[in-house]
Amino acid sequence: MAAIVERAPSLEFPILTGVSAGAINIAHLAAYRGSLAAAVDALRREWGRLTADRVYRISPMRLARTGLRWLGAMAFRRHGGPGMVRGLMDMEPLRRFLARSLDLRGIDENIAAGRLRAVAISATPYASDQTVTFVQGAEDVPTWRRALRYSLRTHLTLDHVMASAAIPILFPAVRVNDQFYGDGSVRQTAPFAPAIHLGARALVLISSRPDPETPRVPRASVRAQRERQYPSLAEVMGMLLHTAFLDAPEADAERLERINRLLEACPAGSGAPDGLKPIHLLVLRPSQDLGSLVAAQRVRLPPLVRWVVRGMGGEREAAAGFLSYLLFDPAYTTALIDLGYADAHREWSRIERFLRVTGGT
């Protein structure tokens, strides 16, 4: 984003949607009082300040207490009450950090000024089998209800942001009104849908999954493959988290491109079925496997987290995916930002063509 707004300083995104860590990003962009270019610059600085102790808190006592509660729940079939397990880590440091850096009152101001049409944050209610998208926008912004997903108009608060970023098991659920919510990626089968419902006709997907041709950190080392080592818990957790967070956007992108091709094939004047319209899509991918960046920064995990991760088999090469969900360090985030910046400049001709076709520049 920094490279894009540097070359297209007047660019604005009137519709912003996000889940998980993306909810933090779009909340910042939607609430910032100023241009998109200034908002992106400020967001870049905030990520540069983020450290593990500003995201989560974990201690030997908390780990021991959590383990005892799990054992007690299994032994005595206690599944509720004040002593129940609420996550391995405490997210209160992240709440305090965001409370100081986010002023969500700016969303209403940007909507009133016409810089923003709508912002949407999705979260997963644990008492339901549906994904809920919380929407704040102009008065004529629609709501929707579809199979397994629906929207609610609201004024977004820090609770909505925290709920969308609460990775199950690792972090406690967050209460919003009368329900407890977790990470919005968990059940989101159509991540592009909120933006399309809100009227978007052009989408930008910034993926953390590299091109299939890009060399990657191996799923298992050569030695592990030779010895046929059983996959470690960290490898399994990494696979599950990647499935929840990365697979759905990729599948939705393929589905959208297929629909666009079908619409192009419709005879002129015949009208598109179901009122469908083509949606322009730009997918930006990193030029290298992010797992290689994780491996270089593994030592920067907090000592207790590093000890736990080692016990889960996190020292294996293929566990880098799991570690990326725990690694918050300026050196790592700066490396990610620098990679994205360089990649966007490298891809600028494609980005510029997309902006020109969609009226973004």
Task: Please provide the spans of the model-predicted regions.
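Active-site gating loop/helix substructures
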Residues: 112-240, 318-327
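C-terminal helical/tail subdomains of lipid-metabolizing enzymes
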Residues: 85, 98, 261-361
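Patatin-like phospholipase
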Residues: 1-86, 92, 98, 137-150, ...
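Acidic, Ser/Thr-rich peripheral helices and adjacent loops at domain boundaries
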Residues: 217-261, 304-307
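Glycine-rich, charged/polar anion/phosphate-binding loops
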Residues: 105-106, 187-192, 259-271
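Active-site periphery "cap/insert" segments of enzyme catalytic domains
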Residues: 85-123, 132
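Short secondary-structure boundary segments
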Residues: 28, 207, 286-288
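Extended hydrophobic secondary-structure segments that form protein cores and membrane-embedded regions
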Residues: 15-20, 118-123, 281-285
